[in-house]
């Protein structure tokens, strides 16, 4: 088994088309991924197939072509824009006599370079270890010269078992740490939910401009760059929205086509901010030729994390890269804002975004069940004045239980006026 490649290395890239329609944007995105990893592409090899070859993924002739390209260019790694099976990866490494990294391994490497917080690093390591676990097989080149003997009935067998055990132990250890992080996040979320502080979560295809928009809105100076996966760690900031008040804005990891499942699983804690959001701001690069495909790719991941039914406002970003395009709000048949056109880079359209946020969030409804002690008759009267009581019943201890429904703005105003209200929630 070969070590992970280092940034600054030189590679041969392999991209295979499985349809008659050769989509050049797929290849361009792959080249962007490679560039984001800090790897120099010496040669790009393309080809067409109806289905992957079981031994090499590509045909045997193409596999030989790749091996010859490695020798001719002096490349130290071959990068595939596809998911390879452990056996395919191993067969190609033997043929090419260098490391072979598939799309999943490449994305994981970029994530490893980008992670900045302790939590982010743990999440990346977990995904890497899960990926590596499928590739721990009897093929370790540094052990093949060992001779069999007592306790060593095969090349490297004992070492292999030890590594598997260490890998399993480390995975369990990281999962335990991430569960603790998730519990802490959940406590913060629950306190926001009780006070009905809305959470607006930015989602979108990688490099759509989410972090630039986040910075424009909050002036938080989150790391933003024109590269894939510039943001990994979730960042939360409080903002003030007219007629709504305090709102939490969350910036999260960008999505991409064919996002490895291990990655989605490892970033569960980060993506939880998206799953629990009041409103999603789906940021879209309006200047990208694959707008619709990028939207569908994001929707696929949202479905995978059970966030596809959360109310969404589309944000068409980068209008400064379109000709004669002015900021505007598009509305649906109910006259609700459903799309805002803006430029996070120049700030054009930010007032329209805040207007849309006000309209969408102030229209949200708070639903709660409370148990009021006998002495809180005045509070009960307030709910009647607001025409918020849907159901009311007496408890054996003399307290009154209420099921209330009211505009979220009214609920938050009442919480500020009556701080004890939170204690009566059940």
UniProtKB/Swiss-Prot annotation:
One of its GO terms (molecular function) is ribosomal large subunit binding. Disruption phenotype: Disruption does not affect lambda lysogeny or the transposition frequency of transposable elements. Residues 198-365 form the Hflx-type G domain. The keyword Cytoplasm applies. It is found in: Cytoplasm. Mg(2+) binds at residues 211, 231. GO terms for cellular component: cytoplasm; cytosol. GO terms for biological process: rescue of stalled ribosome; response to heat; ribosome disassembly. GTP binds at residues 204-211, 229-233, 251-254, 317-320, 343-345. Its main location: cytoplasm. Keywords: ATP-binding, Cytoplasm, GTP-binding, Magnesium, Metal-binding, Nucleotide-binding. Its cofactor is Mg(2+). It holds the Pfam family MMR_HSR1. CDD domains: HflX. Intrinsic GTPase activity is very slow and can be stimulated by the presence of 50S ribosomal subunits or 70S ribosomes. GTPase activity is inhibited by ATP. GTPase that associates with the 50S ribosomal subunit and may have a role during protein synthesis or ribosome biogenesis. In vitro, also exhibits ATPase activity. Full-length protein is required for specific association with the 50S ribosomal subunit. Monomer. Associates with the 50S ribosomal subunit. This interaction occurs in the presence of GTP, GDP, ATP or ADP, but not in their absence. PANTHER family: GTP-BINDING PROTEIN 6-RELATED, GTP-BINDING PROTEIN HFLX. Belongs to the TRAFAC class OBG-HflX-like GTPase superfamily. HflX GTPase family. HAMAP family: GTPase_HflX. This is GTPase HflX. It comes from Escherichia coli (strain K12). The lineage of its organism: Bacteria, Pseudomonadati, Pseudomonadota, Gammaproteobacteria, Enterobacterales. The gene is hflX.
């Amino acid at each position: 088994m070969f070590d992970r490649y280092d940034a600054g290395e030189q590679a041969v890239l392999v991209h295979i088309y499985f349809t008659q329609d050769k989509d050049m944007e797929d290849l361009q995105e792959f080249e962007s991924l490679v560039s984001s990893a800090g790897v120099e592409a010496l040669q790009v090899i393309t080809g067409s197939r109806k289905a992957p070859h079981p031994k090499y993924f590509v045909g045997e002739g193409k596999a030989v072509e790749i091996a010859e390209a490695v020798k001719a260019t002096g490349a130290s790694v071959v990068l595939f824009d596809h998911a390879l099976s452990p056996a395919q990866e191993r067969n190609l490494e033997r043929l090419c006599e260098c490391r072979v990294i598939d799309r999943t391994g490449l994305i994981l490497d970029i994530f490893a370079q980008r992670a900045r917080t302790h939590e982010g690093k743990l999440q990346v390591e977990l995904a890497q270890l899960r990926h590596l676990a499928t590739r721990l097989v009897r093929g370790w080149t540094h052990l093949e010269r060992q001779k069999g003997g007592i306790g060593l009935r095969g090349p490297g067998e004992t070492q292999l078992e030890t590594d598997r055990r260490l890998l399993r132990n480390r995975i369990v250890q990281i999962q335990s740490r991430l569960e603790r992080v998730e519990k802490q996040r959940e406590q913060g979320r629950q306190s926001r939910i009780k006070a009905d502080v809305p959470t607006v979560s930015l989602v979108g295809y990688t490099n759509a401009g989410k972090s630039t928009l986040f910075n424009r809105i909050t002036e938080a100076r989150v790391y933003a760059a024109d590269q894939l996966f510039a943001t990994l760690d979730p960042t939360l900031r409080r903002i003030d929205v007219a007629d709504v008040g305090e709102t939490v804005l969350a910036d999260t990891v960008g999505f991409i086509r064919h996002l490895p499942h291990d990655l989605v699983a490892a970033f569960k804690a980060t993506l939880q901010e998206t799953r629990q959001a009041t409103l999603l701001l789906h940021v879209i690069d309006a200047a990208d030729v694959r707008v619709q495909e990028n939207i569908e790719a994001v929707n696929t991941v949202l479905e995978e994390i059970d966030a596809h039914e959360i109310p969404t406002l589309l944000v068409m970003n980068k209008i400064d890269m379109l000709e004669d395009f002015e900021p505007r709000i598009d509305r649906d048949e109910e006259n609700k804002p459903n799309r805002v056109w803006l430029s996070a880079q120049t700030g054009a359209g930010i007032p329209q975004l805040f207007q849309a946020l006000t309209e969408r969030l102030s229209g949200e409804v708070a639903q709660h069940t409370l148990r009021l002690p006998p002495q809180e008759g005045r509070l009960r009267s307030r709910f009647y004045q607001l025409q918020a009581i849907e159901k009311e019943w007496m408890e054996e201890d003399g307290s009154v239980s209420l099921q209330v429904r009211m505009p979220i703005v009214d609920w938050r105003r009442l919480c500020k006026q009556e701080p004890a209200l939170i204690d009566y929630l059940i």
